[in-house]
């Protein structure tokens, strides 16, 4: 991918996922100036006519988000189980209508019945601690990554942050190959949404060898989503939580935090990491 610089962006045109507003800057309080802000809108994921969840997201790459979310949440196991995705703006946000296979929709309805009455956060309402861990088969050990290639990948991360370079307001998630080349990526104001978008893109690409690189910290949900989609290595620019490490250990995922030039902290399964 070629390097994108802020100077390469035509600021006279509309940018998907960002818009301009008048603001007042320190030392220039008498003169309003135009500034770019990232968009954050409610996005409803609707499966076979039934609204499943509303997420706050940047309104770009929403088809990839729908596919990646469906995979990382275990609603489907393969892209072919979604027959159609239709993105429709509404007065209050955006609806993403997803047509599921009848088998997967039946499974989703059963899950919704089991979840009835729970609150919105990821862990709240779970009756047993073991319920935090999804029944994901432990990952195989088929991947390796040399940390000498990590700096090259980090230098390319901003390439997928067109909105982020204008606003300073988005997270990035990217797929990097063992040579440290960034093959593709996505951005969003939400780190989980950025990751889901990437996982949706990856599901349609022949990307097998490599790792996930995210610009954020690594929470247990980020680890779980990555493992659910079969990726064996997750690099996070910031730290990992204790639960993220525990989940990564259980699923055989190699988790690396503080992934910065000349630096990396390997938390789990270091046998995949070379130097």
From Swiss-Prot:
Cystine crosslinks: none
Binding site for Mo-bis(molybdopterin guanine dinucleotide): 258-263
CC per GO annotation: cytoplasm
Pfam families referenced in this protein's UniProt entry, alphabetically: FdhD-NarQ
Residues of the active site: 121 (cysteine persulfide intermediate)
Highest classification ranks of the organism: Bacteria, Pseudomonadati, Pseudomonadota, Gammaproteobacteria, Enterobacterales
Biological process, per Gene Ontology: Mo-molybdopterin cofactor biosynthetic process
HAMAP family linked to this entry: FdhD
Taxonomic source organism: Yersinia enterocolitica serotype O:8 / biotype 1B (strain NCTC 13174 / 8081)
Location (main, coarse): cytoplasm
The organism's place on the tree of life at top rank: Bacteria
UniProt-listed InterPro entries: Cytidine_deaminase-like, FdhD
GO MF terms held by the record: sulfur carrier activity; sulfurtransferase activity
Annotated signal peptide: none
Protein's job: Required for formate dehydrogenase (FDH) activity. Acts as a sulfur carrier protein that transfers sulfur from IscS to the molybdenum cofactor prior to its insertion into FDH.
Gene3D superfamilies: 3.10.20.10, Cytidine Deaminase, domain 2 (3.40.140.10)
Protein name per UniProt: Sulfur carrier protein FdhD
Keywords recorded for this protein, A-Z: Cytoplasm, Molybdenum cofactor biosynthesis
Family the entry assigns: Belongs to the FdhD family.
Record's subcellular location: Cytoplasm
């Amino acid at each position: 991918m070629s390097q994108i610089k802020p100077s390469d962006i035509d600021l006279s045109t509309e940018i998907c996922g960002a818009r301009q507003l008048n603001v007042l800057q320190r030392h220039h309080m008498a003169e309003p100036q135009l500034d770019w802000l990232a968009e954050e809108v409610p996005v409803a994921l609707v499966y076979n006519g039934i609204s499943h969840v509303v997420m706050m997201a940047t309104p770009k790459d929403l088809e990839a988000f729908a596919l990646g979310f469906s995979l990382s949440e275990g609603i489907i196991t393969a892209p072919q189980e979604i027959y159609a995705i239709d993105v429709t703006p509404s007065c209050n946000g955006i609806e993403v209508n997803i047509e599921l296979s009848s088998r997967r929709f039946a499974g989703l309805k059963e899950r919704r019945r089991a979840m009835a009455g729970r609150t919105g956060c990821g862990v709240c309402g779970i009756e047993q601690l073991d319920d935090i861990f999804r029944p994901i088969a432990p990952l195989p050990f088929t991947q390796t990554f040399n940390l000498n290639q990590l700096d090259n990948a980090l230098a390319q991360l901003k390439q997928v942050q067109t909105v982020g370079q204008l606003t300073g307001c988005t997270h990035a998630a990217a797929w990097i190959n063992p040579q440290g080349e960034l093959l593709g990526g996505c951005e969003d104001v939400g780190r989980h949404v950025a990751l889901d978008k990437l996982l949706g893109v990856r599901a349609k690409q022949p990307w097998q060898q490599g790792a996930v690189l995210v610009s954020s910290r690594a929470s247990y949900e980020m680890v779980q989503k990555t493992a659910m989609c079969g990726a064996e290595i997750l690099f996070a620019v910031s730290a990992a939580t204790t639960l993220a490490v525990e989940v990564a250990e259980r699923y055989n995922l190699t988790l690396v935090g503080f992934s910065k030039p000349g630096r990396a902290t390997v938390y789990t399964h270091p046998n995949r990491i070379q130097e």
